[in-house]
C-alpha cells in the first residue's frame, strides 16, 4: 500500500478557495455548482448561511448545559432512543469493520424534541440545503420521518486530547439513499474553528493518494459538503494535550443526516 502524503498547505488553500461559495440565505442553493465541486474535489464550503454570532450562542448554551453524567454507552441504544434527545460517548472499533474506530461524543437533538442548545433554527437551515441538494421538498423529513427516512439532527463533539474518527466511507448513508436516486453527500456545520478551538487535527479526506485537511481555512458557521463515498475522517484533535472528557473543549460540528426509519 502506498504512503498517504499530505497535500501541501498552499494547494489545500487553492483547493478551498476554488470550491468556496459565498451564499445569500435569501437565494436558491447553487446545486449544479456544488455538484460540480463534489465531482472535481470531493468537498466544498458554503459560507454566509449561518453567522459566527449564532454559532457562539449555541456553543455557550452547550457549554453551560453539558454534563458528562449524561453520557450513555457508545453502543446498544435503540433507534427510538436516538430519535429523542440522547447523548452517548463512543470509544473503540465499530464491528464488523475493525479499522473503523473513533472517540466521539454524539448528542442527538431531533426537531420534534426540546431545543436544548438553540440549534433547531440552524438545523432547519441545514435541512433546507440538504433537501435542495437532494432535489426534495424544502421541508422533507423535517419534523417527522418521511418516505422511510428520518433526520438524525445531532452534534458531534471530538474531545480535546484524543477525539478522532478513522478514515472510512459513510456506508449507512449510502445504503439509506441508494435506492431513492439521491446523491451521495454529507453536510456538516462548523461549530468550532481550527486554530482557535483546537490547534491540531480535524476533518480530512483522502483524494488521489493525498491527505487533504478540509478545515484549516473554515470559519465558524461554514457548512462543509463532501462526497460521502470518499474516504474521510477526523484526525486526532490536539493529541499534544491531555484527554478532556469533562468539558466541551475540542471540535464541535452538527449534522442532519438522513437514516432509514426502523421504528415503524
Question: Language model features by range: what are they?
Answer:
Residues 155-160, 175-197, 254-258:
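Short, conserved beta-strand element in jelly-roll/cupin
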Residues 183, 194-264:
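Catalytic core of Fe(II)/2-oxoglutarate
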Residues 50, 89-153, 158-159:
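Signature of the catalytic double-stranded beta-helix
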Residues 1-40, 70:
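Fe(II)/2-oxoglutarate
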Residues 44-50:
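Short amphipathic
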Residues 165-172:
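Histidine-centered catalytic micro-motifs
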Residues 172-177, 242-243:
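Short, P/G- and charge-enriched loop/turn segments at secondary-structure junctions
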Residues 63-75:
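Cytochrome P450 catalytic domain signature, combining two hallmark sequence patches
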